[in-house]
UniProtKB/Swiss-Prot annotation:
Biological classification of the source: Bacteria, Pseudomonadati, Pseudomonadota, Gammaproteobacteria, Enterobacterales
Pathway membership: Purine metabolism; GMP biosynthesis; GMP from XMP (L-Gln route): step 1/1
Residues at which ATP binds: 232-238
Protein name (database record): GMP synthase [glutamine-hydrolyzing]
Assembly notes: Homodimer.
GO MF term (any one): GMP synthase activity
Length: 522
């Protein structure tokens, strides 16, 4: 019983793995478990504390998940996060309601005088980690309106009286916000205090990303069989390619497909990048007409993603048959899986969006799947990429979705629309680079909207399309802020797009954060 663990109860939140990530940062061993786990399953584990995750569900739903009473009676500290706080409150006799005012994104919490150890506010010189107000990240519609007997308020916001609560006797805590998200400015410190000071967790370990272990795992899994990998030009597929190549050498074949939905001169750029990473087998294929034909008449974003994903798989299988390859490698990372996952306790419409590399394999696909990065976040992938010598322009190249421009053209896909968007996007990115802003922004791109707007050009009335610019700043792509690009630069981008791209009459800038908005529009 020397090993100590923090138990993370998963209610289907997209942030559950992010909670686990924070445990890794803190140095705590953890177990992620379904909410249906029973106490008897944990008898041989030294559980020092419990974290209850968020959820897309509501405790007001008839079939809302909850932990069993024997878990609540384990006599260890418990911290409920968002939904986790709601279910804790409801099970202990409090009340939760859906309020007319929702909170998504930043909120300022005021820490009250009757603080707990969770919000340590000793303001001596050596302990100024906390202030009486903190910025936190909210994502909720329901709110606690009555707390159970024995609980006190720790913090409030303008719209949420019970932003944080605690029961001193039982060491039960609840926070309405998400401390696991990097945008909660003191979130790490809150979780760190819960684990080390409240749970008295002492078995601190140092997690490390072992490249050698990843390569060895690939080698042992694949043996002497051939692997094909869809190379997109982004950091995820490039890092996967280098790791797999180190493991199996020339048994790796990278497939680079021009599907007509790529950025401007993308294939040429990929060829130039390949020269910088070494001798890797790359096969270039042009399937523009095939992809555009398959998307004819489709407007629903999920159907677009699945159509593209299925066609990718079919082409990979065709190439695998030619090469006699048994494996398909993908640069899937954990946020892809989170957005595509459907927990079995959830309704079907609670998943966020499908990713082409996380779709179920279509019929007729015989390939085995290899995903060396699937448990890693983007910042972890960047650390590995840097260690294995991948050039900076790949590491910090902005992500590009697998379905490409298809999810940046709202509505039906036409070659004409692709050309318009490609030109607008190239202008936006080139302006960011010329102003030395590109590498300071996590992701930037243009979106072609399915609406037209009136303009006057050369004394003539024009009724043409609208482009939306999107730029965000983020560490792990699980939450994001819109990038505060100077007006002068936005003005230059807008003028150039309207003057240089035929068919565009108006340019707008997207100032939505994640959550609630996803980074991509579709």
């Amino acid at each position: 019983m020397n090993n100590q663990y923090i138990l993370i109860i998963d209610f289907g939140s997209q942030y559950t793995k992010l909670v686990a990530r924070r445990m890794k940062d803190i140095g705590a061993k953890f177990i992620i478990s379904s909410w249906e786990i029973k106490k008897k399953e944990l008898l041989k584990k030294n559980i020092k504390g419990i974290l209850l995750s968020g959820s897309p569900m509501s405790v007001l739903d008839d079939k809302s998940p909850y932990v069993s009473k024997d878990i609540l009676n384990m006599k260890v500290p418990i911290l409920g996060i968002c939904y986790g706080m709601h279910t804790l409150v409801k099970q202990l006799g409090g009340k939760v309601e859906r309020k007319s005012v929702r909170e998504f994104g930043y909120a300022s919490i005021k820490i009250l005088k009757n603080h707990s150890n969770l919000f340590y506010d000793n303001f001596e010189v050596s302990e100024k980690n906390y202030t009486k107000r903190q910025k936190v990240w909210m994502s909720h519609e329901d709110s606690v309106i009555n707390i159970p007997k024995g609980f006190s308020i720790i913090a409030s916001t303008k719209n949420c009286k019970y932003a944080a609560i605690f029961n001193k006797k039982n060491k039960f805590y609840g926070v309405q916000f998400h401390p696991e998200v990097t945008h909660s400015e003191k979130g790490y410190l809150i979780l760190n205090r819960f684990v080390k000071n409240i749970c008295n967790y002492t078995n601190v370990i140092k997690y490390s990303l072992s490249i050698r272990k990843i390569i060895l795992k690939i080698k042992n899994k694949v043996n002497d069989e051939k692997v094909i990998l869809g190379l997109s030009g982004g950091i995820d597929s490039f890092t996967s390619a280098i790791l797999i190549h180190k493991a199996i050498g020339n048994n790796l074949f990278c497939i680079c497909i021009d599907n007509g939905l790529l950025r401007n001169d993308e294939i040429l750029k990929i060829k130039n990048l390949i020269k910088k990473v070494g001798k890797i087998n790359v096969i270039y294929i042009n399937h523009k007409k095939r992809f555009l034909k398959s998307l004819n008449g489709i407007t629903d974003p999920e159907k677009k993603r699945k159509t593209i994903g299925n066609l990718f798989f079919k082409i990979f299988q065709e190439q695998a048959d030619i090469l006699k390859a048994k494996w398909l490698a993908q640069g899937t990372i954990y946020p892809d899986i989170i957005e595509s996952s459907q927990n079995n306790l959830l309704k079907k419409d609670n998943f966020i969006k499908s990713h082409h590399n996380v779709c179920p394999l279509p019929k007729g696909i015989k390939l085995k799947i290899l995903e060396p990065l699937k448990h890693l976040f983007k910042d972890e992938v960047k650390k590995i990429a840097k260690k294995i010598g991948i050039p900076k322009e790949i590491i910090f190249r902005h992500p590009f979705p697998g379905p490409g421009l298809a999810v940046r053209i709202i509505g039906e896909i036409k070659e004409e629309y692709c050309n318009i968007l490609r030109m607008a996007d190239e202008i936006f990115i080139s302006e960011l680079k010329s102003e030395n802003l590109y590498f300071n922004i996590s992701q930037a791109f243009s979106v072609l909207l399915p609406i037209k707007s009136v303009a006057v050009m050369g004394d003539m009335r024009k009724y043409e399309w609208v482009i939306s610019l999107r730029a965000i700043e983020t560490l792990d792509f699980m939450s994001a802020n819109w990038a505060n690009i100077p007006y002068k630069i936005l003005n230059n981008v807008s003028n150039r797009i309207i003057n240089e791209v035929r068919g565009i009459s108006r340019v707008v800038y997207d100032i939505s954060n994640k959550p609630p908005s996803t980074i991509e529009w579709e």
